[in-house]
C-alpha cells in the first residue's frame, strides 16, 4: 500500500520550507498542550505517554515508552506549520478520536494495530494537519482532551540523541554502558552498541544516511524518518506459564527475556530479505508503509518477545541488511 504522508498537507503551500528559526517560540505550544516538548533542528516535538493504560502481553506488563506513546511533530513551512503525528489509542477510542480529529481539521492518513496479542488491544492513528502553530496546538489539545488521551506534566525532557553503532562494529571504546535499576543491558549493548536508558526501556535511534523528501519537502529524522528500536526487560524466565518456549526441557539454562518494539526504515529492495530475517527471529511485522518519498522508502513497524540476546542478534543482522543502501 502506497501512502502519501506529507504531500497531502502542503498542496498550495509551496515545497520550500523555512530554515531553523533563531527563536521558534514553541513555549506557546507547550502552554496550550500543558506539557513540555523538545525543540529540534528546524521544528518541535512533543510526546504524550499513555500512562493511563495497563498494557500486557501474556500477562507481562509493558511500559508506555516501549510503544504506547503519542508523538507529534511541528515543522514550520514558508507559510504556516506542518503537523504530523501518531495517536495511540484503544480500540474503543478510535471512533470518538477519529471524529474529533476530522472535526478539528486533521487528516487520518493511516490506522494500524500493534498486533502483538496485547491486552487491551492498541491502535495507532497517523495524522497530518496544517495551519499556524498556535491553531494546530489548540486543535490538537481539543482532540486529546476529549478522549482524554493526555496527562499534563511540568517535567522538562532532556535533549538526547542516541545512534546505533554500526551493526558490523563492536561498541566504541570508552562508551558508557547503559545501566538501570531494572538491570543492565550488557548483553544487548555488546551486540548493538551503547543505548540510552529511559526508565525500563533501552532506546536506539538510527537515522538513514541519505536525505529523504516528499514533493520537495525534506523529512528530517526527528519527524520519525529513522530506524527506532526499544527494548524492555520483562519478568520471568523461559519455561514458565507465560507462553515462553520451555528451554528447561531442552537442558538449557534460563535466559533474560525482553520485549522489543519499533520501526525500521529501509528501501523497498531490502524489505523482503529484512522481513524474512525478522520472521526467523520471532519478530512480527505489525504494519508496512510504502512511502511515496524520494528515494522510495518503506517503514516496517515491528514487535517481538524472547531472549534479549537472540533479539539483539536478529536486529544486528537486520541492520546489516538495511545499511547496504547507505554505503
Where in the sequence are the language-model features?
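Positively charged n-region of N-terminal signal peptides that target proteins for export
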Residues: 1-5
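Bacterial N-terminal signal peptides
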Residues: 6-16
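Boundary at the C-terminal end of the N-terminal hydrophobic targeting segment
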Residues: 16-22
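Intrinsic disorder/low-complexity detector
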Residues: 23-57, 63, 145-214, 245-248, ...
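Intrinsic, low-complexity N-terminal interaction/targeting segments
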Residues: 57-76, 108-113, 208-237
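Extended intrinsically disordered, low-complexity coil regions enriched in Ser, Thr, Gly, Ala
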Residues: 63-66, 90-116, 220-223, 268-293
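Structural motif
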Residues: 73-84, 232-239, 251-261, 324-325
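Hydrophobic, ordered structural segments
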Residues: 91-108, 119-174, 280, 298-326
